[in-house]
């Protein structure tokens, strides 16, 4: 019986290459239609140093003192951002003079929601609170992309003596606290002393960690299949620490409360963006620890008209939030007792 003629080796190689290319193209198309990865549309400059920030040896970065006219891709014109000393954003036309030390102090800590991302100085929550209460000194320590852990470090640095301390908490801070891949991902290698500080729980104790960020691979920016491989690699690398993010975050909130109370102050958590189950869990936790909180579980929180295009609070939402946190908890006359101060209209 005659044997059938075998195809040339070159033909087999070519066929396999064509099959591989077609399969890769098909996989790319499926990932493209599925919108994967979500970070594909992130700013290609992410990881570079914005002018309004400077590196910090403990916090990773903080607001740089000065006045900045910033332009945003989805907004017309520019936004005036004024930063004072100590990494604070302005809450008044002039930075408080030395005699302000004799007035009750209100500190606001958090991420870009507190800082006032894409908002002018006068549209931010702390500025609005300052206008409602001219008899106190309000400080805005909110900083873009901060985690609860960085707010904890900032409280350790700046809260000395009695003060009313507010921390605006979003549920996505949990991932940042444990350095999940979504927070660490950068397109540009961080330089100039910038880094991502995070913490891990070891035998119940906080252990400080630092990361330069996870640089997106060159091919990940061009092939979604490669991006998927990098995604799973980063998820596996971070799994051990991210799985404990809820416990870690709750530990941070307890320590923040302890620091403020040790200084004879009052600590309050503002529960902002989170799912109903997350909100329920954090309410239960804060109540069990006797930590004061303001729950923003209101219909207005879901109103897209009160948000900027990227989801940050607008001035209108900040005006509402300033009402929701009333009566303002203020430590008066450097006494360890906190009392409510009525809103001034």
Predicted regions and their residues:
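Membrane/wall-proximal cationic-aromatic binding patches
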Residues: 36-133, 300-304, 324, 345
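N-terminal Lys/Arg-rich, disordered targeting/topogenic segments
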Residues: 1-10
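Hydrophobic membrane-insertion alpha-helices, especially the h-region
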Residues: 15-32
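Conserved SGNH/GDSL esterase-like catalytic core that processes O-acyl groups on lipids
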Residues: 115-192
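Short, amphipathic alpha-helical "lid/cap" segments that border enzyme active or binding sites
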Residues: 148, 152, 246, 250, ...
């Amino acid at each position: 019986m005659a044997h059938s003629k075998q195809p040339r080796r070159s033909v087999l190689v070519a066929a396999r290459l064509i099959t591989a290319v077609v399969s890769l193209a098909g996989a790319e198309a499926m990932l493209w239609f599925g919108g994967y990865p979500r970070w594909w549309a992130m700013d290609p400059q992410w990881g570079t140093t914005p002018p309004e920030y400077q590196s910090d040896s403990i916090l990773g970065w903080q607001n740089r003192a000065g006045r900045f006219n910033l332009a945003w891709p989805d907004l017309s014109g520019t936004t005036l951002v004024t930063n004072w000393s100590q990494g604070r954003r302005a809450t008044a036309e002039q930075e408080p003079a030395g005699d302000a030390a004799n007035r009750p102090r209100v500190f606001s800590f958090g991420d870009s929601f507190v800082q006032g991302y894409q908002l002018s100085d006068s549209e931010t929550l702390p500025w609005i609170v300052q206008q409602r209460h001219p008899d106190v000194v309000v400080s805005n320590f909110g900083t873009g992309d901060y985690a609860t852990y960085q707010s904890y470090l900032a409280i350790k640095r700046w809260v000395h003596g009695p003060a009313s301390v507010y921390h605006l908490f979003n549920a996505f801070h949990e991932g940042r606290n444990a350095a999940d891949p979504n927070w660490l991902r950068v397109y540009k290698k961080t330089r100039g002393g910038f880094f991502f500080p995070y913490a891990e729980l070891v035998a119940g104790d906080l252990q400080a960690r630092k990361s330069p960020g996870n640089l997106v691979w060159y091919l990940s920016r061009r092939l979604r299949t490669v991006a998927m491989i990098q995604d799973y690699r980063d998820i596996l690398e971070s799994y051990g620490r991210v799985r404990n993010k809820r416990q870690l975050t709750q530990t941070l909130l307890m320590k923040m409360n302890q620091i403020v109370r040790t200084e004879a102050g009052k600590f309050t958590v503002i529960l902002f963006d989170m799912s109903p189950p997350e909100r329920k869990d954090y309410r239960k936790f804060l109540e069990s620890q006797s930590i004061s909180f303001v729950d923003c579980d209101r219909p207005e929180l879901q109103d897209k008209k009160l948000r900027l295009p990227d989801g940050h609070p607008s001035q209108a939402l900040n005006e509402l939030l300033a009402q929701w946190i009333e009566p303002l908890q203020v430590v008066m006359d450097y006494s360890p007792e906190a009392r409510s101060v009525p809103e001034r209209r």
